[in-house]
Amino acid sequence: MAARDGDGWIQCRCGSKHWGKFGAAGILIFRENAEGGREIFLQHRAPWVHNGDTWGIPGGARDSHESVIDGAIREAVEETGIDPQELLIRTSSTDNHGNWSYDTVIAEATQELVAHELNDESHEVRWVLFDDVTRL
C-alpha cells in the first residue's frame, strides 16, 4: 500500500482553508429502492471532523498517487465499509479552485449495497429518499 500523504490543510486561492494537500474527493451514491423511489447514500459526520455534525457524502483528502475515483472509493470504504464491486461509476464533477479541487464521483449502487459506520468519522450512515434530503 502506498503512503498516505494527502492529509493536511491547504490555503486556497479562493481565500478558504481546505482539507487535502492534493485535493479531495467524495462519492455520491444513488439507487432505486424496492418501491421505485430514488435514494441517496449519506453520512452524518462526527462533530470533530471538517464540516462536522453535518450530512454529506463520504469523502476526504486524496493522496498524491490516487486518481479521483480511487480516492473517493477509498474514503467511502474506510468510512462506511461499502463494497466497491456493488457500484457502477456514472460520471464525476470537479469544483476547481486553481490550486485545490474537490471532485464528486457519482455512482449507482445495487440494492444489495450494505454500509455502516466503520470509523469514528461518522455518527450515522443511511439511505435517504431524494425528496427527504433537505429535511436532515
Task: Give, region by region, the residue ranges found by the protein language model.
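Conserved hydrophobic "DFG−1" position in protein kinase catalytic cores
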Residues: I29-R31, L42, A107, W127
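Short, flexible active-site-adjacent loop segments at beta-strand->alpha-helix junctions, enriched
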Residues: A24, N33, A46-P47, A61, ...
